[in-house]
């Protein structure tokens, strides 16, 4: 992660042109004592957006955050024909917007590249998307929780696409595995879909809510045994 995705570049004997343009390396392969650096986050983010029908062509894109993932998202958006890419920062520099200014940006797509909303700070949301009419998609690269507060608010607002970053995480790892093994994995899209589905089953919980004596504990223990999951009773915690 940042800052290591940038710092590691000075130790690489070869840097893939895409990684060099982005300014970040997330995959390093030792080939006969020489370190080769690549960026698979680009492919992972592109896969995530393609899988959910996020179309950058002709759109104004608002990127929250200024770290290495910002550069990756910016590269994908520009390569796919975004008409304008705007950056939002808590401490805006030249050419950047503050969060207070973001609502008036006229953006159709918002991408969060900050840790805001990541576990354990799951209730954090830096941007009030309810004041942004015309939004078509909200993408959050955070994958834990599977739906951040930003994604949940986007769903509540009826924005057509509201998605977290789990598929990006899996996809970039699938492409990285290809570099580690010396050849691309067969059908990376299918591999990504399969692994993502398995991870979602592991990550998502079953929550039982009801009045005292309704049978939550009994049903919960039975479900936990059948699903091979840990049972948690908040009355006992």
PLM features per residue range, with description:
Residues 141-203:
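Adenosine-phosphate binding glycine-rich loop
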